Amino acid sequence: MYLLPLLFPLLNLFISCILGKFLGKRVLFVLVINMLFSAIFSFWIFYEVGINKSVCYIDLGPWFHIGLLKLNWLFLFDSITSVMLVLVVFVSLLVHLYSIDYMSGDPHIIRFLGYLSLFTFFMLMLVTSGNFVQLFLGWEGVGLSSYLLINFWYTRIQANKSAMKAIIVNRFGDFGIYFSLLVIFFFFKSFDFGVVFNLVQFLDTQPRMSFLGFSLNRVDLIVIFLFLGAIGKSAQLGLHTWLPDAMEGPTPVSALIHAATMVTAGVFVLIRSSPILEYSSTGLFLVSLIGGLTALFAGTVGLVQYDIKKVIAYSTCSQLGYMFFACGMSNYSVGLFHLFNHGFFKALLFLGAGSVIHALLDEQDMRKMGGLIKLMPLTYVAILVGSLSLTGFPFLTGFYSKEVVLEIAFSKFSINSFFIYWLGVFAAFITSFYSIRLMYLVFFARPNSHARAVNSSHESSSFIFYVLAFLGFLSIFIGFIFKDLFIGLGTDFWANSIFNLYVNSDILYAEFLDYYYKLIPLVFSIVGLFFSLFVYFVIYDYTVFVVKNKFFRYAYFFLAKKWYFDLLYNNIFVFNLLSSFYLLTFKIIDRGLIELFGPLSFVRLINKSSIIFSSFQTGFLYNYIFVVLLGLMFFIKLTSSLFFPSFNSFFNFGLFICLLSLIIFLSFGNKKQNI
């Protein structure tokens, strides 16, 4: 029963590959029904494990055994797993249903849904794994599936580039996971969560190395490597560049990647590894710092984007930053609650954007939209609900988790936490601004689309409408429904699945903060909302002001270039690495060493040898006689050394005379020939 949510998506992959060719589009409903069954069993697991506290371990038997390394197929179903199962499977079900209509005109829709099911399966493999190697299998599978889906329209060169960029950038993060696995096995001789989490407290905490001014112990080393992997997969500052380019895939792919899979994998690994993170103060500080910086960075870049999907993509990057610094503040339950809430309203935003793109004949530039509020009122309501929930508007889903994240940062009462708190507050202001900007450019601005696109604009079909309506309902109420269960004071929902040292637990302080401290993030969000309304609905010539003012013009260029990360990476790392490896592999190895010791060297050796041997062909009899005598002397020398050792000196002298005579006569013969 517990493994059925994993088996149905895997079954979908085989059905789409084997039966899709014969059944045609009739197989689509079979795939959706299988995902429905997977969702039903996921809800049952949530009730059985999360509500009834029946944690389940399933050992399917040995996987491989090499020396000290013995691994079994082990599945762990605890509270964390049950929450992630509901989120991943339910969002995947809605995306499958949405894709039937959205991709109806694509001849490869069956392959597309097969890839979606494969994506879902690997994400479920990741969240249900009972050891780090099995988790790594799901981790790599998610990366592979994202490549297939981003590059689904493989005839488009930009899709090819984006898919390659996603998988290459993630390779750098994956090196962190590789090294963390090596270090974990070196210290614990096991990969099982139970063994590692119970023994980590006994590791030597004395500093063993220093890096960038930080003294690191063994636990710090594990945490930093895990964190590097999480940075890559969750698109945090430094390895974020692949996320906006991933928008080249179909819109349902973007919804699934940003709402429930791929980018949430990094946050999940940090939450799952909470027993390790709690013993590393340095690691926790780095997690919270990078999370806060990412929240601010992604928000500022989202301010100047005009691609509707990229605006939402940068909002995902920003919200993941909130989740990271919640984990860095040792409040993993709050981070997971925000991840859970974020999945629903982010899916709503992407699928709503897909409805707009679908209606405008695949147009994604918001400058070419406008005036759609009368043509698509239901889509407008859906995106409005998603945007307000994203900003943390009171009593919507995002409000119940986003505000708590900031309250916890404030309740730490340290300089580091105050700095990160204000990063999050300013990010909340910016989020409100670009959310209203998106609404204005898409629905309220003067129509700038082609007449044919505007005339064909209409609300989407029933599949898309029901999916948006249901996600809109969840984006309003799901946070209120689960707040007390997930992060309520005294809740025991998480039991032992999340570990907190008592010195790091500050949820109690956040609960009893003064109200004016709690209102600061909300006030900044509302101010950002009204400021955006003022800029876009009152000041119509704001672009002229930006262009004329030198400071704002340079600031705009800086943000439009995405803080120059892509430019720096291309000019400093990519170009120099390509030039260096070109010089090494082509100039030095291929055209250098291989030619020197390979074919060219062999040809030169043959030519020189032929010149030397041709010099013996003089045409004079006495030269040939000396060669025969020389060979005879060598033979006699060899036999005498074996049978007549006393004659060695005599034959050595005779052999020397013959060699000397041969050289003289050869020289004389060559000179005579030249004459």
UniProtKB/Swiss-Prot annotation:
Transmembrane segments: 3-23, 27-47, 75-95, 108-127, 132-154, 177-197, 211-231, 251-271, 284-304, 311-329, 334-354, 380-400, 413-433, 462-482, 519-539, 564-584, 593-613, 624-644, 649-669
Keywords, in A-Z order: Electron transport, Membrane, Mitochondrion, Mitochondrion inner membrane, NAD, Respiratory chain, Translocase, Transmembrane, Transmembrane helix, Transport, Ubiquinone
Listed GO MF terms: NADH dehydrogenase (ubiquinone) activity
Localization of this protein: Mitochondrion inner membrane
Tagged with keyword Membrane: yes
Enzyme nomenclature, EC number: 7.1.1.2
Cellular component, GO annotation: mitochondrial inner membrane
InterPro entries linked to this entry: NADH_DH_su5_C (IPR010934), NADHpl_OxRdtase_5_subgr (IPR018393), ND/Mrp_TM (IPR001750), NU5C-like (IPR003945), Proton_antipo_N (IPR001516)
An individual GO BP term: ATP synthesis coupled electron transport
Annotated membrane topology: Multi-pass membrane protein
Enzymatic reactions: a ubiquinone + NADH + 5 H(+)(in) = a ubiquinol + NAD(+) + 4 H(+)(out)
Pfam families referenced in this protein's UniProt entry, alphabetically: NADH5_C, Proton_antipo_M, Proton_antipo_N
Major place of residence: mitochondrion
Enzyme class: translocase
Family: Belongs to the complex I subunit 5 family.
PANTHER family membership: NADH-UBIQUINONE OXIDOREDUCTASE CHAIN 5
Function summary: Core subunit of the mitochondrial membrane respiratory chain NADH dehydrogenase (Complex I) that is believed to belong to the minimal assembly required for catalysis. Complex I functions in the transfer of electrons from NADH to the respiratory chain. The immediate electron acceptor for the enzyme is believed to be ubiquinone.
The name this protein goes by in its record: NADH-ubiquinone oxidoreductase chain 5
Species per Swiss-Prot/TrEMBL record: Acanthamoeba castellanii (Amoeba)
